[in-house]
Amino acid sequence: MRHLTLSIEREVVRAIEGVDLVETRRCYRDQNEFVVLDRFLTQPVVDPFLREVGVLTPDVNRNYVPGHKKGGSVSFYAIMSQAPAILSLYRSPALLTFLSRLVDAPLMLCPEDDPHSCALYCYTQPGDHIGFHYDTSYYKGK
């Protein structure tokens, strides 16, 4: 696992080096705090994440909240036990620093004992969606 973590971290650092932070931050602000970084990570880096999504598929919990969302999710506990690559990306110090700089605010990981600290959301069926919303933190800060 340590080798996987170091490998993913190295690739995240490499990807960040290719991003124009000033321009990306401008786009982020101009687009109501939303930005897409096409091909941020190379396909060989993404492939382990996709394999893990396949492993996690049986753990998808589907739900529907009228007017808000319809889709599925996989819990943090399943990710911790079955998806080391996804977890390494979530915990990447380089990614956290980059995102903090992008949004111009300090970001932190949620505590390990919070079952909602990291989840995989799956919008795979016709009609799946998520409405506009703002997630607030239950911890100190925003």
Language model features with spans:
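Catalytic core of non-heme Fe(II) oxygenases with the double-stranded beta-helix
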Residues: A85-L87, L96-K142
